[in-house]
Amino acid sequence: MALSWRSWLANEGVKHLCLLVWLSLNVLLFWKTFLLYNQGPEYYYIHQMLGLGLCLSRASASVLNLNCSLILLPMCRTVLAYLRGSQKVPSRRTRRLLDKSKTLHITCGITICIFSGVHVAAHLVNALNFSVNYSEHFLALNAARYQNEDPRKLLFTTVPGLTGVCMVVVLFLMVTASTYAIRVSNYDIFWYTHNLFFVFYMLLLLHVSGGLLKYQTNLDTHPPGCISLNRTPSQNMSIADYVSEHFHGSLPGGFSKLEDHYQKTLVKICLEEPKFQAHFPQTWIWISGPLCLYCAERLYRCIRSNKPVTIISVINHPSDVMELRMIKENFKARPGQYIILHCPSVSALENHPFTLTMCPTETKATFGVHFKVVGDWTERFRDLLLPPSSQDSEILPFIQSRNYPKLYIDGPFGSPFEESLNYEVSLCVAGGIGVTPFASILNTLLDDWKPYKLRRLYFIWVCRDIQSFQWFADLLYVLHNKFWQENRPDFVNIQLYLSQTDGIQKIIGEKYHTLNSRLFIGRPRWKLLFDEIAKCNRGKTVGVFCCGPSSISKTLHNLSNRNNSYGTKFEYNKESFS
């Protein structure tokens, strides 16, 4: 199938427009700052001393200021959840844009790493030029104490140098601990190192307070390149001759452009010596707003989550899947949202996000999550919830004499799956444990489907073995029977795909016989599936939601952008559980 521009604009248009705006801001800031320090008269003397390193260091710093402010905004989860649920964002396309917050965070992080490298390299050159081009006439301009001072002293004995080295170390730890391998194998390392961001920002505010780079303040009485009245220059002294007496060693900036500007005229006579002053730090202007917003949100979340939940029951499902049912006063959530669990007995500072598989309603206050035991945190959490003698039991009711650990929740927070009920037709695709975000959607339909726009749901679940399916089969079985009894058999189209066949007839045939016709061996034929959905829903907009491996996600994403002969538009949404 050929690319559909209609579908592509729906899925990618706003995202690429925002990317273009962000990229334009970065380029504009970099170029404007570069030209300012390269051609600005107030930076003439410092530019002659440092050359290109000055321009690159300041231009990269402006890009860092922008991205260090933007990177915090996607982490304001409560604000994003409020915007998604409020009437102030009525457009579904705008709400879908909020789901790209993680992408913006990662993009800004990569940009910070790249331009930090440029910034560090430029300042290494600056340190060398400060030492080599030491000026005896403009002492206030020097960062070095004498000519040919060891540049390493500038890096490790000055506030900007020392804080810069510390920031590079902190940034290196945060970046290396953010890799997929570390997040999966040892989430603790990722969590603790990422919380070093506060140290990074404090160092950043100290870094810009050093005032090593200075600009000229008295341009009216001392035009750049002039000579003062207390000197008697030779009649034909040029600007290059004059400045060469003030700066020892090579001049990295050169004077060809300056000679052209003055048309090789004699140096002007000035009224006083140049005066230099350090810039007032501007970084705090960039980051103070987002940083205060983030800190205020964290404070609000801390207050909101300071009361522990009451654990109603713990269910140990096959395939190392745990179900946790809880209750908390005044807790409200929408289908598709997620919460963050914090168990001090497992880790004092570590938190983990889990999608709600059961939301509270007007008639019941119970809510729950499912999680797969993978990684050190979930293993320790499982051991606290289940006593050793009950590891293989199915359910531990609340009335049992069991002392559960204290558990705190933060949230709820928004996710793309909130939109699944706002389409007339939705296609939900899950891979393995990625089925959990859809559990709350199905539970909501089981309670009452009439208030929502959704009238047809295609539910596709790809599992490795039958035990992965077993813990979710009860909900699918009840939901399937509900719509058959209400004479709406086409409301939910369930398709289950398993790659292993051992024991299928024994387990499925006895308890969930009505799902036998929905069970398939192998993998879905995605292109045929999309063609069938497009044919049955001509001219409609279908919401595509995926939570699973990247291979499935990429396939669905590509098919959503493809053209079809039925006028059906597919809008792609994705949630990552990695």
UniProtKB/Swiss-Prot annotation:
Spans through the membrane: 17-37, 63-83, 105-125, 155-175, 189-209, 425-445
Subcellular location: Cytoplasm; Endoplasmic reticulum membrane; Cell membrane; Cell junction, Focal adhesion
BP terms from Gene Ontology: bone resorption; cardiac muscle cell differentiation; cell morphogenesis; cellular response to cAMP; cellular response to gamma radiation; cellular response to glucose stimulus; cellular response to interleukin-1; cellular response to mercury ion
Location of the FAD-binding FR-type domain: 304-419
Activity control note: Activated by insulin. Inhibited by diphenylene iodonium. Inhibited by plumbagin. Activated by phorbol 12-myristate 13-acetate (PMA).
This enzyme's EC code(s): 1.6.3.1
Known role: NADPH oxidase that catalyzes predominantly the reduction of oxygen to H2O2. Can also catalyze to a smaller extent, the reduction of oxygen to superoxide. May function as an oxygen sensor regulating the KCNK3/TASK-1 potassium channel and HIF1A activity. May regulate insulin signaling cascade. May play a role in apoptosis, bone resorption and lipolysaccharide-mediated activation of NFKB. May produce superoxide in the nucleus and play a role in regulating gene expression upon cell stimulation.
Protein name: NADPH oxidase 4
Protein species of origin: Rattus norvegicus (Rat)
Gene designation: Nox4
